[in-house]
Amino acid sequence: MSFRVDGDAGHELEIIDNVSLRVDDGEFVVVTGPNGGGKSTLARLIMGIEQPTEGVILFNGRDITHLSVTERARLGIGYAFQQPPRFKGLTVRKLLSLAHGSTLPEDVCCNYLTEVGLCSKDYLNRELDSSLSGGEVKRIEIATLMARNPGLAIFDEPEAGIDLWSFAMLVDTFKKMHDKGENSIMIISHQERIMMLADRILVIDHGRVRTDGSRGAVLPTLLGEFACECDFREAAK
């Protein structure tokens, strides 16, 4: 699959360059790599927010390349944005029920919020408006995706805007989701603690797959690269 956009002087920019990716049932895949390498674009292509210039996207054997975001969501693909939208007039409790497809009991809604580090009594009846911080909205969206329980759950940098305590709870939540084996999980992240949960790690660099392998094969090399980069920065001070 490839994705290009118009650049300067009529030249096309290759954002995703002939990338092939397979996520098996129940598999946990982390996509990582340098900033601007194409990771988030890959996730947006899978969700249907962007359309590939070339190639096809299959979900459970069905060609979904030209399906809309809504149609893909109905088939069982869920997506948590880096910067989630706000819905003035809609309460958190109502949003969770809408995501689930039916009215959820209060205790179930509370459990979803607790799992993402939010005090349920403080948030259950709040509206998704400008009174919520970016980090709060981010956590609510992740809880919403959990309530939907999609076949493929895509999280785009879920750690963004979240404090360390809440992040620890999120990591535990992702582990529980994976242990259940009900969902395939794809997370865009640089975080070692998230990569430690992965079955497989995919490294995207300049729109291409640089590395694709098991956590045991890929993570030690990545950590070595990070250590070298930190040593270089320290020496340059």
Where are these regions (language model features)?
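The feature captures the beta-strand-to-loop junction immediately N-terminal to the Walker
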Residues: 32-34
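Helix-to-loop junction immediately C-terminal to a conserved catalytic motif
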Residues: 47
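Conserved ABC transporter NBD signature motif
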Residues: 55-62, 108
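ABC ATPase C-loop
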Residues: 145-146
